[in-house]
Amino acid sequence: MISLKGGETETVGRREGTGEEGVWNHIKPSRLGIYVGITYLFLIALAEILTVEDARIGITAHIFILFATLIHSTLTSDRNLSAFIMSLVLAPLIRILSISMPLTHFSRISWFMLISIPIFIATFTCIYLQGIKLGDVGFSKPILRNIPLECGVIPLAVPLGFAEYLILKPEPLPHHSFISASLILIICTGLVEELTFRGLLQYNATRVMSKWSGILLISAIFAVLHIGNLSILDCIFAFFIGFLFSIVRERTRTIYGISISHGLINIILFLVAPLMQ
């Protein structure tokens, strides 16, 4: 990803009739993006901690963050920063949907599929409203020299999937067709989550801050959304996976390989490893 280009922050907070600049105008655009990102990271993490204590309080906190991002994005004069804040709405939306749709009413595989549909729609709505090309969010033509890296990340899913199983130890899923369940996991967790985080969010983040700051921030947001698994080790693991996938996405400019790898990790975690115990 690239550092901020051609998106100099417009004057924010200028008082009409006086020419006096607001305090925000003295902050470099890249630093302002970092401050905004860290603020929302903190709020999302706080909402996740509250969810662990009481799901009703947690979902209320996520709803607050959702509306805060929507309102904040409309009040921000810098176009790139506004787009970044708008895309952050996807993080609380994911948790609102997952918390409000309990597993007791659906099998886990069906749950993954149902959750992914509104997330997929919301992500593409952001892409459309922001006028982003599909190639900018990872749907670009693979470059020949990047294919080894694109394909090389896929087999890493096997040890990573077993490693996450050792952390979480999920129960075996009820009987499902292995093929259909695998396809759902690849598309509904792999593709949708990679499009959301390494596609849209990473693209917007690296336009308002440096490449590495954007990668670290999105990896951290991805990690804190795993707080509900009640494992600090899993949050660290999720950060590592997110960081790894972000680097591959940055080098290859696509999300094909990491989407398959992400899906395979979940196939190992939920379908393969539990049956081997």
Regions found by a protein language model. Give the residues of each.
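N-terminal, membrane-interfacial amphipathic/helix-forming hydrophobic leader that caps
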Residues: 1-130, 274-277
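Aromatic-anchored segments of alpha-helical transmembrane domains
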Residues: 40-49, 89-101, 156-165, 219-227, ...
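Membrane-interface starts of transmembrane alpha-helices
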Residues: 54-57, 104-115, 181, 206-218, ...
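Juxtamembrane helix-loop-helix connectors linking adjacent transmembrane helices
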Residues: 99-189
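Interfacial helix-capping/hinge residues at the ends of transmembrane alpha-helices
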Residues: 134, 198, 202, 242-246
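Acidic (Asp/Glu-rich) catalytic motifs at the cytosolic membrane interface
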Residues: 190-198
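Functionally important transmembrane alpha-helices
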Residues: 191, 208, 212-277
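Membrane-interfacial catalytic/cofactor-binding modules of polytopic membrane enzymes
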Residues: 192, 203-204
